[in-house]
Every structure is written in structure tokens, then in C-alpha cells.
């Protein structure tokens, strides 16, 4: 993996050097694009460099990895702005994923004493959710083979958004008011837990820390993450869930932008120059 500006060297000259000393050749050379700012390329002399370490310290490595892999097409240049990054974190991570996990675990705790129930009574929305959940792994794997990381993540988020819609369709809070609908409620809660378990596997190559946090809340942190398990939809029953702090707290965009501008700075640096001298003074200089 090299910058796109040095692909030629690493695909022609470097292999030739390796061949001359009979060393193994690289099987594939990948060139990544540039992350650009509104003023063009980042430059230390201009003082417009974004420090990834500071972003990780503030938002976590998983959030930054997700943004970079989801926002930019691998191999192409991409424009970076604080607004785009923060909105992506809020909408995708806090709203879609984080809220889904929090709501599901909270409902299992409230309506079934924190125990993931078995399937008892299925309806039409269940089959659609299961089909999307079990079919996502093959799509993600295919995109990964093509280094289409953004599309792979979009496939996972299609499942996440479908699961959020499933909550609105089934309305567990309404089912919980009618004891006669307990079997239906158990099935809904089970399906939600299964969908989240599936997500925890699918995001593992991209966001392993987040995956672990989700599995901890589902009570399966001690179980190995197996890719093929994402193609199954009946693996949970009897696990004790545990709600914890939000995986991705919602961000105040305006406040965060102010903090980021303080952290990174956006002013262009100019070199220091000495005061100019007159022609008469210059004539006095001995240049021998």
C-alpha cells in the first residue's frame, strides 16, 4: 500500500531491484489517493495539516476508521472537512448503530428481564429482516475482494437501517402492553438481538473495538467472532444482556468544530523575513 504518486516506482523499479537480489516480488501494489482540504493538499508549511492522533484521542480509532473507509473511494482523492466527518459520525454511528444497540438492549431488559428470548411467533417483517441479515455477509465479502470498502460498509448499514425500521414496524412497546402478544414480543426481541449480533460480526474487520462492545452488551463477548455465523439467524437464546454507556455518543457539531479548529489550526504559516535594506546600504556590503 503506497501513495498514488509513487506507484510507478514501487511497481517497476522496486520489483526490478528485488529481482536482482532474488527476493520475492509483491503480488499486488495498491495506490491510495490523497485526503484533500478545501485549499488543496495538506502542507506543514501552510499549517493546514489534520492530526489523526488528535482525532483518535477525541473520537476513538473506530470512528475515524469508519469515516475514512466509508467516505472515500479507495484509490481516489477525497475532500476532508470537519463538518462532513462529524455528520457522518452522528448520523451513521450515533443515530443508526449506537441508537439501535441501546434501544434493543434496553427493551430486552425492560420486557424480558434482560434475557434474550427464543423465537415463538413469526410474521412477514421477520422473514425480510432475516433475509437481509443472512445475505449481507456475501455482499460484504465480494466488495472486500474488490477493495470497495465504502460499498461494503454501505451494505452493512443497509442491514442496520432495516433493523431500525423493523422496530418501527413491530412496535415492541405496544406488544408489551398486551400479555396475549408475549410470544410475538419475544420473537421481535430475539430477531433484534440476532440482527445486532450479525452486525457485530460484519463490522469486525473495520471496527473491532465497537464489535466487542456490542457483543459485551449482548452477553456473548466470550464467544469467538466467526464470519460464517453472520449467515445464521438462530444462534441466541437465554443470554443475559447488559446495557452500558452509548457506543457512540451524539456530538454537538458546532461545539466540536470549534474544538477541532483550536486543535488543528487553519491559519497559513508564513516564513519570517528580515527587514529590507536600502540600495546604498547594499553597496556597502563586501561580497568577496
Q: What kind of region is each of these model predictions?
A:
Residues 77-82, 134-142:
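Short, charged/polar, low-complexity loop and linker segments
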Residues 101-140, 160-181:
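Conserved, charged catalytic cores of large soluble enzymes
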Residues 142, 147, 157-288:
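Basic, alpha-helical terminal appendages of large translation-related enzymes
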Amino acid at each position: 500500500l503506497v501513495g498514488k504518486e509513487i506507484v510507478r516506482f514501487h511497481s517497476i523499479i522496486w520489483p526490478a531491484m528485488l529481482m536482482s537480489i532474488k527476493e520475492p516480488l509483491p503480488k499486488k501494489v495498491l495506490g491510495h489517493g490523497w485526503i484533500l482540504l478545501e485549499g488543496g493538499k495538506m502542507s506543514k508549511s501552510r499549517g493546514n495539516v489534520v492530526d489523526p492522533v488528535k482525532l483518535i484521542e477525541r473520537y476513538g480509532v473506530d470512528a475515524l476508521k469508519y469515516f475514512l473507509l466509508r467516505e472515500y473511494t479507495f484509490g481516489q482523492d477525497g475532500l476532508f472537512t470537519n463538518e462532513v466527518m462529524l455528520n457522518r459520525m452522528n448520523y451513521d454511528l450515533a443515530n443508526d448503530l449506537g441508537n439501535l444497540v441501546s434501544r434493543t438492549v434496553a427493551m430486552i431488559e425492560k420486557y424480558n428481564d434482560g434475557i434474550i428470548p427464543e423465537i415463538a411467533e413469526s410474521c412477514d417483517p421477520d422473514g425480510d429482516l432475516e433475509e437481509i441479515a443472512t445475505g449481507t455477509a456475501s455482499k460484504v465479502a465480494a466488495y472486500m475482494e474488490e477493495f470497495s470498502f465504502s460499498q461494503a460498509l454501505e451494505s452493512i448499514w443497509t442491514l442496520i437501517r432495516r433493523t431500525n425500521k423493523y422496530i418501527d414496524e413491530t412496535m415492541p412497546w405496544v406488544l408489551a402492553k398486551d400479555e396475549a402478544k408475549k410470544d410475538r414480543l419475544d420473537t421481535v426481541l430475539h430477531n433484534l438481538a440476532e440482527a445486532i449480533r450479525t452486525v457485530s460480526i460484519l463490522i469486525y474487520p473495520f471496527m473491532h473495538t465497537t464489535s466487542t462492545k456490542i457483543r459485551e452488551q449482548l452477553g456473548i463477548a466470550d464467544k469467538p467472532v466467526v464470519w460464517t455465523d453472520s449467515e445464521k439467524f438462530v444462534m441466541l437464546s437465554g443470554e443475559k444482556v447488559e446495557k452500558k454507556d452509548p457506543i457512540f455518543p451524539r456530538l454537538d457539531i458546532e461545539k466540536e468544530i470549534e474544538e477541532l479548529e483550536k486543535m488543528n489550526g487553519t491559519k497559513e504559516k508564513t516564513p519570517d523575513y528580515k527587514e529590507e535594506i536600502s540600495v546604498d546600504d547594499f553597496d556597502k556590503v563586501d561580497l568577496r
